[in-house]
C-alpha cells in the first residue's frame, strides 16, 4: 500500500450486463442429493476455473437527506446530458481483456455530438457500443480520442439521430473544484439506469490511484470525495450546484470505504477544444512518472531550506512537490534523472503541479526542455528531448496462429519500469497459449530469430510453414528475471490468416488487412526412437507395457458440445501398432474438430485423426501413420475376461509429471456408475458403465494408465472422466476410474478389421436397483431368484432413470419406448444384470424388452438409436455465438428439443455476450421466421444488414420462451461455419460469410477465434488448462 492507501483501489466499471438478466438454465445439480440406488463416484479430482468477470462490490448507503430546491433544479438539467454506455472491447488489447460492460458518460458538445467518459470505457482496443439517453433514445457511438495516460476518452454520436430529446451539454469547469464543495455524482451506478450520489470534496492533491495490474492513471493529481459510487459509475460527471462538471468519476475503494476518486477536467477540456478545432491532441513525455510528495518527505530526499522557502513563498497554498518515481530505461530521461529527484523548475519556471507540467510537455513534442531538480541537496540541471506519447502507445495489433500481439505499451512499461520495446502477447491463445496465462508475455525470439518489435515478429512468422514446431523464448512481464523456452506448434490451418488491425480514428473502427497467406506444411519425415527402460521394477509385465503407451495432445480451435477446454493432454494405449490405433479417454479427445498429436517414446511426434468416438463409455480411438514411427511400439494385449473384485493386479499409470509409476495392488470394488450431469451446461459424460477402483494411492494421482496382469495382458484401462462443475466454486470434477478391456473389444476388433463401427444404442440412462427395492417395485420372487443365480457377485437389476430426447425424425409411441421408472428384466430374452449385457443393443434395430412398469410385467418393442447422428458435424459462428445441433449430452438431459439451433458457447466482447444470448439456449425464430435447423437460420440471418437490430426468439433449457434483440456486427464478428468434410486434410472445412471480403459472401476462410475467450456455460468463466488438485487415498464410489 502506498501513502494514499491504493492497495484497495478499484475502477468503477459495471459487471452487470444483459447476460446476467436471464440465466440460461436452472438444472438442479446432481451432486447434492442422489436418487436412491444411484451410484456416482464420490471423490473426484477438482481443478480450478478462473472467473473473468469483475466483481461489483455493492456498498450499503445510508438514506441521503432531501436535496434543496437548488440542487433539484440542477439535477433535472444535468440528467438530460448523462448517458448510459453499453460497450464491448471485442478482443483483448494492452491492459484489457475482451469484455462487455456498462458505464456512464455525459454530453460535452451537443452540436458536434461529443461525449466525455473514462479511458478504460473507450478502451485501448477495438470498441463497439451504444449509448442510451435519459428519455431512452439509443444511438451508436464511436471513439474519437482515448488518452494514452489519463483516464478519459471522448466518444462521438450523431446528434441528428436523437429526435425526441433536446440535447444539452455540461460545461467543463475544472477550476470550480474546491475542498469542501458539495457535489453530486450522476451516473449509471451499479448497472442501474440512473443513480444520484452525493458527497463533499475532501482533497484536491491526491496522487492517482494504482489499480494494480492493468491500466492505471499517473502523472496527474486526483480529487477525493466520499460518494460511495459502485460499478457502472465510471465516466459519471461530478457536478456542483451550478450544474457544471468539475471532475470525472474514475475509481474508488473496494474495501467498503465510501471513498471515490475523480479526475480533474483540465486535460479533458484541452483535448476537447483541440478536437473541436480539428487539431491533433499532442501529448509529450520524457517517460518519467512523477508523484506528489509532501514537504516533509521532500526534505528527507534532500530539498534544501532555501528552495523550500522559495516554493512556499511563490505558492503559499502548496504542501507538496513533484518527485521522480519511475524513469524508464532507454527513455529520454534515462541516465539523466534519478528516482527521488525533486523537481524545481522546467524551462526556468518554478513548478509544483502536474497540470502545468503536462502543459509544457504537450506543447514541446520533438523539442528539448530544461529541468532543474534537487538530488540529495544538490542542484542538477539537465535537458531532455520530449517524445511523442502517442508513438509509444500501440494503435495496431497482429493476429496469427490464434494469438494476438502488439508492441509493448507505455502503460505496461511504466508499471514494471522497463523499456518501451518488445512484442507483447495480449491474447495468449492458439499456438501461443503459454503456461496457462491469458496475457502478459514478451516474445524475445521465435525459431531462433530475435523479435525485438512487431515488424520483426511478423517477418519471422511469415516464413514459418503450417504445422511446424519452433522454439520460442519468452518472459512474463511480471517476472522478467525468468526466461522461458517452449516448443510451439504453429497452427495456420484453423487460423489461416495473419491479420493486421490498425486503429482508424476517423471511423472509430479498426481496419483489418491480410499480411500473408500460410505456407503449406512440410511433408512429415520418419523418425527413429527407443522407449525408456524401467529401472528397479520387479514386474516384467510393467516393463513391457511401456512400449504400448503414447502421449496424446488434443487442441480444439472451437468450443463445441459444452466441453470447457481448448487443449488437453494425456496418455493413450496402442491397441494395434501396425495400423497405429490408439485408445484414449474421451475426456482428452472429446470431438473430432481438433488437432491430435501423438508422441511416441517421448521422441517422435506425429499427427493423428479420430477414428471412433464411443457415445457412452468415455473412450476415443485415434489413428496415426505408423510408417512415420521407427520405434519398437508394441500392441497391447487386451484381456477377454472381466477382472474381478479382490483380484491382484499391477497398476501402471502416468503422474502429473508425465512419469510412469508402478504399484502392485488389488481391485477394491467394481460398481455400476454414471458420471453426474453438469448443471450449468450439458457436456459429454460416461453413463451405464462398470467402474473399477484399486487399493493404491497412485490411482488418484494418475489420470491415465492400465491394470495389467502378471502375464502382461491388460485387464483394464485407467481413464479420466470429466464430471460436473460445482455451482459454488466453479470447479470441474474429474474422476479417475478403471474400465475393463472386454467392454472395449466389440468396437476395437471392428476398427482393427478396417470396419467403421455403426453402433446402435438404447436412448436411455439407467441405474442399479437392489433386490429390496425391486421387490417393492413389483418384481416377482421368481425373477429375484433368477437374478441371484445369474449374477452371484452382484444381485442387481437396472431401472430407467432418464429417457433421452430422440433425434429429429425419430418417433416412438409411449407403448414401444422406455419410461422413467421401468425396471429392465430381459432384452431379447437375455436376463440383464450386468452393464456388459447391454451390449446386445449395438447391432439390433429393435429389442424385445421384458420390463416391470407400475408393478406390472409387460413386453415392449424398444427401437435403438443410430449413433452416427449423435456426433457434431457442423457449427455456425454468428455474432460471437457458436451454434450447433443439440449434441448427445443435451438430449440426455432435456425432455424436448425446441429446435436444432443450439447455443453451445459465446465469445467475450461479442454481440451474443452483450445482449445476453447465453449458452444452452435454443433459437427458434429470426425476425418472426421459424428456424428449425441451421440451414434456415443461416439463410435468415444472411438477409440482415450489418449494424442492424434483429429479433431472435429463443427458449431456455428450462422451456422458458423469450425474445432477445441483437445488433449484427459483421466487421468484428463475421459469420463463419465449420463443416465436417472427410475429404478435407483436417477433416473439417471452414466457410466464411464475410461479405466485406468476399463478393458472394461465401469463401473458404476462418475467423481468428479464441476458444479460451469463450464460455460454454452461463456462469461466465474463462477456462484455463487445469492444474489437478491431487486427492490422496483411495477412490471410492457410492
Curated annotation (Swiss-Prot):
EC number: 3.4.21.-
Group of enzyme by EC: hydrolase
Domain PDZ: 289-374, 877-958
GO function term, MF aspect, one: serine-type endopeptidase activity
Extent of the signal sequence: none
Entry's localization field: Nucleus
An individual GO BP term: proteolysis
Protein name as annotated: Pro-apoptotic serine protease nma111
Record lineage: Eukaryota, Fungi, Dikarya, Ascomycota, Pezizomycotina
